[in-house]
Amino acid sequence: MTNIRKSHPLXKIINSSFIDLPAPSNISSWWNFGSLLGICLALQILTGLFLAMHYTSDTATAFNSVTHICRDXNYGWVLRYMHANGASMFFICLYLHVGRGLYYGSYMYTETWNIGVILLFAVMATAFMGYVLPWGQMSFWGTTVITNLLSAIPYIGTNLVEWIWGGFSVDKATLTRFFAFHFLLPFIIAAMVMVHLLFLHETGSNNPTGIPANTDMIPFHPYYTIKDILGLLLMITALLTLVLFSPDLLGDPDNYTPANPLNTPPHIKPEWYFLFAYAILRSIPNKLGGVLALVLSILILVIVPLLHTSKQRSMTFRPLSQCLFWLLTADLFTLTWIGGQPVEYPYVIIGQLASILYFSIXIILMPLTSLMENHLLKW
């Protein structure tokens, strides 16, 4: 008699995806982040569901309902801060996951990669709409500034902004629809994750060498389930440390002031995980140019597979490309820092130089360096 996990219609899908799945024997801890992202998503959906039970999406009561959750609902403060800081953990894992893909050439699986880029956009949209819901000062003004960017689109811009707002300014209609979309999108993301995995399992995982590992595979369970649990414990430890010791470390103090359309905060800035894109947006003096640069800063990931000129897939044996990769990483840290600074000398020029470097590395320097490495290896 065959094992039920191999014969039952539902159990065998789970079995072939998480238990008997053949995985390369040499994948490192950089391959942990996929499972961590899945756990982050589940955590966000669960905490979000319980928060939604107490939250009211009305401009008059939204701020007070969040206060009520923190003060009166049983362990409401844990739910609220797990959800807020869970988003930060989500983005840390996301950026490391994308970085791993860039370093080891995982983007050569184009379907998996492109769905991943769409997922990144979807998560960013969800996080942006979630930031609006507490209806604090930064919620209100952040939304006003970012949605207003769409007015830079020729002809339809102004109408589009008013259509998204549901009026002539960010108001009750905006808050209600953002709550609806913030609730809906994670479930769409979960469905897209399934498609992401479906395409990944068509090809199998990449590995640090970038060489096909078909001759040396091991079952996912128990080897990588145990390995992933270690990553999970480290992430949960970091998250709980953040939630229980300094839950507001990554937030903005301005968001503890109820939204006031008549009083603009001195420095409007998004959450830390959007600061690099915000810095790129601000580095271009033209509104439409800034918006295009903002979108391209993420959309550039789609053309990465087209710009792959190396004869090797991974960067493991390519020291020059490695230098560029870590320069890009440092550049992203610089952009994140600049995004949180006021628009004044010397931050403006640093932001502009960092933005130029960001696009130069990805579009020009990486492909040229790869060609040079091919030549040096006489390939």
Curated annotation (Swiss-Prot):
Keywords: Electron transport, Heme, Iron, Membrane, Metal-binding, Mitochondrion, Mitochondrion inner membrane, Respiratory chain, Transmembrane, Transmembrane helix, Transport, Ubiquinone
PANTHER family referenced in this protein's UniProt entry, alphabetically: CYTOCHROME B (PTHR19271:SF16)
Claim: Electron transport is one of the keywords in the record: yes
SS bond partners: none
Gene3D superfamilies: Cytochrome Bc1 Complex, Chain C
Record family assignment: Belongs to the cytochrome b family.
GO cellular component terms, semicolon-separated: mitochondrial inner membrane; respiratory chain complex III
Major place of residence: mitochondrion
Taxonomic source organism: Myotis albescens (Silver-tipped myotis)
Residues that bind a ubiquinone: 201
Protein's membrane topology: Multi-pass membrane protein
Name under which the protein is recorded: Cytochrome b
Cofactor note text: Binds 2 heme b groups non-covalently.
Note from the entry: Heme 1 (or BL or b562) is low-potential and absorbs at about 562 nm, and heme 2 (or BH or b566) is high-potential and absorbs at about 566 nm.
Required co-factors: heme b
Transmembrane segments: 33-53, 77-98, 113-133, 178-198, 226-246, 288-308, 320-340, 347-367
Function summary: Component of the ubiquinol-cytochrome c reductase complex (complex III or cytochrome b-c1 complex) that is part of the mitochondrial respiratory chain. The b-c1 complex mediates electron transfer from ubiquinol to cytochrome c. Contributes to the generation of a proton gradient across the mitochondrial membrane that is then used for ATP synthesis.
Annotated GO biological process: mitochondrial electron transport, ubiquinol to cytochrome c
Pfam family, one: Cytochrome_B
Binding sites annotated in the UniProt record for heme b b562: 83, 182
